Swiss-Prot record:
Keywords: Mitochondrion, Phosphoprotein, Ribonucleoprotein, Ribosomal protein, Transit peptide. GO terms for molecular function: structural constituent of ribosome. Pfam families: Ribosomal_S18. This is Small ribosomal subunit protein mS40. It is found in: Mitochondrion. Residues 1-35 form a transit peptide. The keyword Mitochondrion applies. Residues 245-258 have a biased composition (Polar residues). GO terms for biological process: mitochondrial translation. Its main location: mitochondrion. Belongs to the bacterial ribosomal protein bS18 family. Mitochondrion-specific ribosomal protein mS40 subfamily.
Length: 258
């Protein structure tokens, strides 16, 4: 009897050890209470820039020279997009709710760069030196919001005279194209101008047929007053007026009006 009881106890010992091992597992409370990090928490916030009031001093500092050198701020920027063809429009903005998105544009990625109409050296990097045209946003990679600020700042800088731009003056060439090439010559006048005839044939007087005239006379017999012939070749010229006659008419004019 005692042996059978001992055997049953020994058989149940491994099952008890398994239950004990399962109860001894300790789960930390931190893993059960914490939430997964959201996308907004993973984004970095915008730090405060020391050059906010005077942004042009940053472009003269050694930090700027070490980071960019003599190249524009957008020279080494590459857009992150799907496929081999980039979209024709950049993102609307790189900073949402004071959080910077991934791969921000050349201006939003450096918190020490500020778009201001007094920051002339920064504005000159986004204007073509030959034509004076502002570079498009897909060319420089800046977001739509920063591109709008750049356009307004460049226009304001031009109005204040801080950003110099010129319109090239092209001098006309003093060449006579009629003699510059053998195949080019003076255009001959029209044949109608040489003969003295009008340019259009319907402007010339044509005598209507006599049969048509007789028919019209019978039709409008009671309404015709006089018959008009062909128009005169030239209008009659009025004799020139002497200065004395012109002055006398000018003096009598106001009196007759009264």
């Amino acid at each position: 009897m005692a042996a059978s009881v001992l055997n049953t106890v020994l058989r149940r010992l491994p099952m008890l050890s398994l239950f004990r091992g399962s109860h001894r597992v300790q789960v930390p409370l931190q893993t059960l209470c914490t939430k997964a990090p959201s996308e907004e928490d993973s984004l970095s916030s915008v730090p405060i820039s020391p050059y906010k009031d005077e942004p042009w001093k940053y472009l003269e500092s050694e930090e700027y020279q070490e980071r960019y050198g003599s190249r524009p701020v957008w020279a080494d920027y590459r857009r992150n997009h799907k496929g081999g063809v980039p979209p024709q429009r950049t993102r609307k903005t790189c900073i949402r709710r004071n959080k910077v998105v991934g791969n921000p544009c050349p201006i939003c990625r450096d918190h020490k760069l500020h778009v201001d109409f007094r920051n002339v050296k920064l504005l000159e990097q986004f204007v073509c030196a030959h034509t004076g045209i502002i570079f498009h946003a897909p060319y420089t990679g800046v977001c739509v919001k920063q591109h709008k600020r750049l356009t307004q700042a460049i226009q304001k800088a031009r109005d204040h005279g801080l950003l110099i731009y010129h319109i090239p003056q092209v001098e006309p060439r003093d060449l006579d194209f009629s003699t510059s090439h053998g195949a080019v010559s003076a255009t001959p006048p029209a044949p109608t101008l040489v003969s003295g005839d009008p340019w259009y044939p319907w402007y010339n007087w044509k005598q209507p047929p006599e049969r048509e005239l007789s028919r019209l006379r019978r039709l409008y017999q009671g309404h015709l007053r006089e018959e008009s012939g062909p128009p005169p070749e030239s209008m009659p010229k009025m004799p020139p007026r002497t200065p004395a006659e012109a002055s006398s008419t000018g003096q009598t004019g106001p009196q007759s009006a009264l």
